[in-house]
Amino acid sequence: MYQSLMTVRETQIAIKEVKTFFEDQLAKRLELFRVSAPLFVTKKSGLNDHLNGVERPIEFDMLHSGEELEIVHSLAKWKRFALHEYGYEAGEGLYTNMNAIRRDEELDATHSIYVDQWDWEKIVQKEWRTVDYLQKTVLTIYGIFKDLEDHLFEKYPFLGKYLPEEIVFVTSQELEDKYPELTPKDREHAIAKEHGAVFIIGIGDALRSGEKHDGRAADYDDWKLNGDILFWHPVLQSSFELSSMGIRVDSKSLDEQLTKTGEDYKREYDFHKGILEDVLPLTIGGGIGQSRMCMYFLRKAHIGEVQSSVWPDDLREACKKENIHLF
């Protein structure tokens, strides 16, 4: 039976260690400045992240003006707008301590309706919009993960070290070609188990089979220049996503992707006009799950062991029977 390597109190102390180390290194190595983040945005702005395009945001109206607001799913689009508003230049970027509510999330060991992540965004020049630049950025972030594991090992040697020396890059099409008989999720399990750490490139568009590896909203990532960082989780014995990131859409790719998804109405939103008219800067960015990080590096079996959220009674009981104590 599962046995946590730390008490609840020890876990809380270690969570701070994980978050503080990673935040400091992320800011330093990607040259990012921390900014204040909104909990909600106006509906008409189009700044909310609509994830896979089907999840419902929490909506409410403001007494003073009656304006409709949405609690954020993530700050994928807001960050790009903020870079423009704050006058950042190519090579400069920002990050936020993002908190969100995703009401339609299917709850399991790795998913909660409460989301906390380091949301970051950086301005790039047109010639930087390449797979090579994407991979270079992934390698920088992976280097932070490696150093974090080493740092924790010095303080908590019983946590062990599992990350390989290098992260492997693979496209979603190469995965389909390698494992045509498997579902996309099972392909992720197979490749993560084989290599320990992988970055899957190109998520959102249809593969040669006609199926997508996974859904992505049409209006933030360029589907050819994005991807997910996956590790093999030693406790769960499955693939484990730490980050979704990518080079963002330019006017050409946004035009193409909105047409593919049948979302031409979004062209009227302020954010989308800003991209289509080349007003907003070209960027790269992503979200790095804070609870996911803590869950992986502290070797936890459930995300509820590293964050406070709401769980159904039957799920709490099931966890208790497996010796999993949720916050």
Swiss-Prot record:
InterPro entries with a match to the protein in the record: aa-tRNA-synth_II, aa-tRNA-synth_II/BPL/LPL, AsnA
GO CC terms of this entry: cytosol
Main localization category: cytoplasm
Keywords from the named record: Amino-acid biosynthesis, Asparagine biosynthesis, ATP-binding, Cytoplasm, Ligase, Nucleotide-binding
Superkingdom as given in the UniProt entry: Bacteria
Subcellular location: Cytoplasm
GO biological process: L-asparagine biosynthetic process
Transmembrane segments: none
Catalyzed reaction equations: L-aspartate + NH4(+) + ATP = L-asparagine + AMP + diphosphate + H(+)
Family annotation (CDD domains): AsnA
EC number(s) per entry: 6.3.1.1
Pathway: Amino-acid biosynthesis; L-asparagine biosynthesis; L-asparagine from L-aspartate (ammonia route): step 1/1
Pfam families listed in its UniProt record: AsnA
A GO molecular-function annotation: ATP binding
Family of this protein: Belongs to the class-II aminoacyl-tRNA synthetase family. AsnA subfamily.
HAMAP family linked to this entry: AsnA
PANTHER family reported for this sequence: ASPARTATE--AMMONIA LIGASE
Alphabetized NCBIfam families for the sequence: asnA (TIGR00669)
Protein name: Aspartate--ammonia ligase
Species this protein is from: Bacillus cereus (strain AH187)
